[in-house]
Amino acid sequence: MPFKITITEDADRQLRFLPAREQRILEAAVQARLEHQPTTPTRAIKRLRPNPLAHYELRAGGLRALYNVEGDEVVIVIVGRKVGNKLVVEGEEFHGHQDDSVEPPGKRAREDAE
């Protein structure tokens, strides 16, 4: 039975931040690799060190999708581009392992503006 793929509102916005070509590459990788065995480690799927946002990473060239598996559903929570050893999300460096109060880039700025 295939897993249901969902994407959070923040991750969808992060995906739309990427150029159209990169969006298509990442969307194709998500469909090809996460529908049937999203937790099986491969060259493209990696289990992450413990952090509050995501348990797995999908790699598609220099693109990354961080996600969790909840029952029969794959929930994509972060989308970005790997630059060297950094993950860049919406043009900002993402720090996912610094503390337990980690939030995706852009979320703090939106909350401050409200």
Regions found by a protein language model. Give the residues of each.
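Short helix-capping/hinge SLiMs at alpha-helix to coil transitions
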Residues: 1-2, 38
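Enriched for short, Lys/Arg-rich terminal
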Residues: 2, 9, 24, 28, ...
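Acidic/histidine-enriched, beta-strand-rich ligand/metal-binding domains
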Residues: 3, 14, 49-51
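Surface-exposed, Lys/Arg-rich phosphate-binding patches that contact polyanionic backbones
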Residues: 13-24
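A short, surface-exposed loop/turn module that caps and links secondary-structure elements
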Residues: 32-59
